[in-house]
């Protein structure tokens, strides 16, 4: 700490930064950083976070209306969007789809 900086100032700076980041996460519609599936996954499952691009469950074609695993077609946007819910997925399903 410099002579002019107090621990109270540092705490305020951290709180301001945290608030700014939380606001950004909310406005972007991102999930919480400490994400979890709604239910506890079984011993042979993992909590899957849907995302764009290649995934263990295959990849959808750009511009496609065909829903892939973890996506759905949004009529109002006229495009595929990522599902916001995390979901438990069985390890065997991941292994079967690993080459897609």
Curated annotation (Swiss-Prot):
Top-level taxonomic group: Eukaryota
InterPro entries noted in UniProt: YOR389W-like
Protein name per Swiss-Prot or TrEMBL: Putative uncharacterized protein YPL278C
């Amino acid at each position: 700490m410099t002579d002019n900086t107090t621990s109270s100032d540092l705490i305020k700076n951290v709180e301001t930064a945290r608030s700014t980041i939380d606001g950004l996460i909310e406005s972007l519609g991102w999930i919480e950083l400490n994400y979890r599936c709604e239910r506890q996954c079984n011993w042979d499952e993992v909590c899957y976070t849907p995302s764009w691009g290649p995934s263990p469950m295959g990849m959808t074609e750009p511009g496609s209306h065909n829903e892939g695993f973890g996506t759905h077609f949004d009529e109002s946007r006229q495009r595929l969007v990522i599902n916001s819910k995390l979901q438990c997925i069985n390890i065997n399903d991941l292994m079967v789809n690993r080459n897609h």
